[in-house]
Amino acid sequence: KQNTDYIDTAIRFIQTRYDSPISVDDVASACGVCKEYIQRLFRKERDTSIKEYLIKYRIEQSCKYLINTDHSVAMVAELVGFNDIKYFYMKFKEIVGMTPIQYKQSQGGLNRE
């Protein structure tokens, strides 16, 4: 297998299961390689860790929910795989630059909290 095949498999795995708990071990198993190898390869090819990629992907998905649904922030956090609302808020603000509520309002999303 080419290195890019492993990365593609890892990304597909994350993108189809982001709403569930995912560990680096799970990603490695899906790719059929050891954890250390996929971590090293992912960082080399994507310039980020698997964990950070997963978090950013979850935040991207949460933005879609915030704009296109009237779900509460807590519900959105749960739908995208965050089981800790404080951690979701912290990561959302770190990545997007504003809170989920501010983002929803700035994008004209439905205003329910």
Regions inferred by a protein language model and the residue ranges of each:
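Helix-turn-helix
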Residues: 28-35
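The DNA-contacting recognition helix of HTH DNA-binding domains
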Residues: 35-36, 40, 84-86
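Membrane-proximal linker segments that couple transmembrane helices to downstream signaling/catalytic modules
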Residues: 1-12, 16, 20, 29
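Terminal helix-turn-helix DNA-binding modules in bacterial transcription factors
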Residues: 12, 16, 21, 44-89, ...
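Residues within the alpha-helical elements of helix-turn-helix
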Residues: 30, 79-80, 95
